[in-house]
C-alpha cells in the first residue's frame, strides 16, 4: 500500500520534465560574445550549450508545460559570477532566469524566450554560526542538505517538505513546511540575505531595507538571492509518528466533516499536529475508483494520539498503516525523498490550480471529488493525477504580523491544489486540462463564499494574477508596484508570478 501511495504522491510533489533544445539554436557566437562573459567568470564557473548532456540536464524542469527557452546555461561558481552574468545579459539585451531544482510550474515562465539560465547548483552549502542561533545557506542548496546538516548538530529550521526542492526558492513565495506551526514560514526565518538586483548589484539586506518586506512572499520579482542567514532552533522533539488511512470516495462528506471537527478545529489545530489528504488512484484499495487518503502526523510521540485517529477509524477505512521515527523520516513516510519517484524526471506536464481554505465545505468537497474522479479514473490519460490538501499547523505563521511581509495568507488553514499530470499531446489537451483545473478550483472557491481566490504562488498555474498571489488588499498591490519600480523598473524579474 505504501508504495502505491508513494507513486501517487510522486505525481504531486516533484515529478520532473525534460526540455532540450536543438544544438543549432543560439543567438550569439560562442567564440565572440560569450568570450566577453567568460573572461569575467571565476575558474569554477561553467557554461553549457544546447546539444550537450550537461545542458539537457541543467535545463530540466518539473513541468513540461510552457517552459522557458534557454540558449545557454551559466553555472556560477560564486556570487560574483551571478553579478557578471546579470550585467552581461543587461548589456546584450538578453532575458535571464535563475533556477535551482526547477520545480516552479507557472506558465508565465514560458515568456522567457532565448535567454540565459543561471543555474545555482554549485552555490550549495550550509554553515552554522558559532553560537548556533543562525545558519547561512547558499542560494542553490536543497532542503535535504539543510535538514540533515542542522539535525546532526542538534538543530532545525523550517524547510519545505520535499527533500529535493531548493531551500530558498519556496521561501521567496512564503514557504510552507513541517515546522511552520512552531516558527512560521520558511521566509519568516530569514535574518539577512545577499541578493543580486536587476542592475547587477550584489547587496546584503535585512529588516532595515524596504526590500525586506517584499522578498518574503514576492521575492521572485526582485532579484536573485545568492545566500540567506536564517534562524535555527534546538530540536524540541525528536520523535514523530504518522497514520495513513485509505477510504472509499463514498465517505468524502463524512471524512471532511471529521477533519473540520477533530483536526482543523476552526483554525486551532494543535501545534504538534499536521493533517494532509489525497484524492488518488490506488488500484489495490479500489480497482475502479479514486480513493481518499487521510494522513495524520504528530510531533513528539511514537503513536498518533487516538483522540485524532479514532474518529477516522469509526468511518471504516479500507486500510490503516502507522509509522514512528524522527523528523528526518517524514519525507520517507510520505514518499518525497531524493530517491523517490517525485524527484525523478518524467517529461510530464504538471499544472496545479491552488486555493487556500480556512475550513472544508464538505458538500463542495463532494462535488469536486466527483468531478476529479470522473476525470482520472480507469485508463484516463490523467490517471496519475492527484488532488492534495495540506493542513499544516498555523500558530507560528499567525503569530507574525500579517502586514510585515508580502506573504498575505497567514489566516488560511489548508493549502490545496489539484495536480493534473499527463504527457504532452498538443495545445487542445492543455486547454482541456486548464478548464478542468479551474473548474475544480472554482467549486472549492464557491464553497467558501469569499470574493477573492487566495492562491499560493509557489503552486500557481499562471492564469491567476497578482491579487490572487500576493493578496487583494490595495495597499499590498501598491507597495509591490512601488518597490518594483524602484528596484526593477525594466521588469527583468518578471517570469515567475509577475507583479505586473
Curated annotation (Swiss-Prot):
Pathway: Pigment biosynthesis
E.C. no: 1.-.-.-
Residues bearing carbohydrate: 199, 266, 275, 383
Enzyme class: oxidoreductase
Stretches assigned to the FAD-binding PCMH-type domain: 65-235
Gene3D superfamilies the UniProt entry points to: 3.30.465.10, 3.40.462.20
Cofactor(s) listed in the protein's UniProt record: FAD
Name of one Pfam family that matches: BBE
Keywords: FAD, Flavoprotein, Glycoprotein, Oxidoreductase, Signal
Signal peptide positions (record): 1-20
Protein's UniProt keywords contain Glycoprotein: yes
GO molecular function term, any single one: oxidoreductase activity
Disruption of the gene: reported phenotype: Impairs the production of N-pyruvoylanthranilamide ans downstream compounds.
Superkingdom assignment: Eukaryota
Function of the molecule: FAD-linked oxidoreductase; part of the gene cluster that mediates the biosynthesis of the yellow pigment chrysogine. the NRPS chyA mediates the condensation of anthranilic acid and alanine into the intermediate 2-(2-aminopropanamido)benzoic acid. The remainder of the pathway is highly branched yielding at least 13 chrysogine-related compounds.
Family stated for the protein in its record: Belongs to the oxygen-dependent FAD-linked oxidoreductase family.
Protein name as catalogued: FAD-linked oxidoreductase chyH
Amino acid at each position: 500500500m505504501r508504495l502505491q501511495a508513494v507513486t501517487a504522491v510522486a505525481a504531486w510533489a516533484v515529478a520532473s520534465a525534460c526540455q532540450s533544445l536543438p544544438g543549432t539554436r543560439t543567438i550569439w557566437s560562442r567564440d565572440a560574445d560569450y568570450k566577453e562573459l567568460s573572461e569575467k567568470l571565476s575558474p569554477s564557473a561553467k557554461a553549457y550549450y544546447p546539444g550537450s548532456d550537461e545542458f539537457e540536464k541543467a535545463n530540466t524542469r518539473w513541468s513540461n508545460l510552457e517552459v522557458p527557452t534557454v540558449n545557454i546555461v551559466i553555472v556560477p561558481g560564486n556570487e560574483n559570477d551571478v553579478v557578471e552574468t546579470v550585467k552581461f545579459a543587461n548589456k546584450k539585451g538578453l532575458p535571464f532566469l535563475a533556477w535551482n531544482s526547477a520545480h516552479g510550474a507557472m506558465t508565465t515562465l514560458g515568456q522567457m524566450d532565448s535567454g540565459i539560465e543561471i543555474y545555482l547548483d554549485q552555490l550549495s552549502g550550509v554553515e552554522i554560526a558559532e553560537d548556533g542561533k543562525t545558519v547561512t545557506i547558499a542560494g542553490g542548496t536543497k532542503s535535504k542538505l539543510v535538514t540533515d546538516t542542522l539535525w546532526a548538530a542538534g538543530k532545525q529550521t523550517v524547510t519545505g517538505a520535499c527533500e529535493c526542492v531548493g531551500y530558498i526558492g519556496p521561501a521567496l513565495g512564503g514557504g510552507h513546511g513541517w515546522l511552520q506551526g512552531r516558527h512560521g514560514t520558511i521566509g519568516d526565518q530569514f535574518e539577512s540575505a545577499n541578493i543580486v538586483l536587476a542592475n547587477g548589484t550584489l547587496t546584503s539586506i535585512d529588516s532595515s531595507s524596504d526590500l525586506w518586506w517584499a522578498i518574503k512572499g514576492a521575492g521572485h520579482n526582485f532579484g536573485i538571492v545568492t545566500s540567506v542567514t536564517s534562524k535555527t532552533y534546538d530540536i524540541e522533539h525528536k520523535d514523530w509518528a504518522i497514520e495513513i488511512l485509505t477510504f472509499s470516495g463514498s465517505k468524502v462528506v463524512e471524512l471532511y466533516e471529521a477533519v473540520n471537527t477533530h483536526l482543523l478545529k476552526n483554525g486551532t489545530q494543535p501545534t504538534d499536529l499536521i493533517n494532509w489528504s489525497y484524492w488518488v488512484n490506488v488500484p489495490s484499495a479500489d480497482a475502479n475508483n479514486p480513493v481518499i487518503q487521510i494522513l495524520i502526523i504528530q510531533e513528539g510521540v511514537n503513536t498518533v494520539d487516538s483522540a485524532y485517529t479514532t474518529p477516522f477509524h469509526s468511518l471504516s477505512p479500507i486500510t490503516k498503516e502507522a509509522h514512528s521515527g524522527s523528523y528526518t523520516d517524514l519525507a520517507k513516510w510520505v514518499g518525497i525523498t531524493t530517491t523517490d519517484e517525485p524527484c525523478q524526471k518524467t517529461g510530464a506536464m504538471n499544472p496545479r490550480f491552488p486555493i487556500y481554505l480556512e475550513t472544508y465545505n464538505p458538500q463542495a468537497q463532494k462535488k469536486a471529488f466527483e468531478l476529479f474522479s470522473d476525470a482520472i479514473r480507469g485508463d484516463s490519460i490523467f490517471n496519475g493525477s492527484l488532488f492534495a490538501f495540506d493542513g499544516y499547523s498555523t500558530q507560528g505563521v499567525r503569530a507574525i504580523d500579517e502586514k510585515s511581509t508580502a506573504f498575505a495568507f497567514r489566516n488560511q488553514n489548508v493549502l490545496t491544489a489539484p495536480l493534473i499530470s499527463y504527457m504532452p499531446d498538443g495545445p487542445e489537451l492543455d486547454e482541456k486540462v486548464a478548464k478542468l483545473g479551474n473548474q475544480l478550483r472554482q467549486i472549492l472557491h464557491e464553497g467558501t463564499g469569499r470574493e477573492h481566490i487566495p492562491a499560493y504562488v509557489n503552486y500557481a498555474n499562471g492564469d491567476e494574477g497578482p491579487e490572487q498571489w500576493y493578496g487583494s488588499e490595495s495597499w499590498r498591490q501598491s507597495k509591490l508596484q512601488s518597490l518594483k519600480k524602484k528596484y526593477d523598473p525594466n521588469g527583468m524579474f518578471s517570469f515567475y508570478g509577475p507583479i505586473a
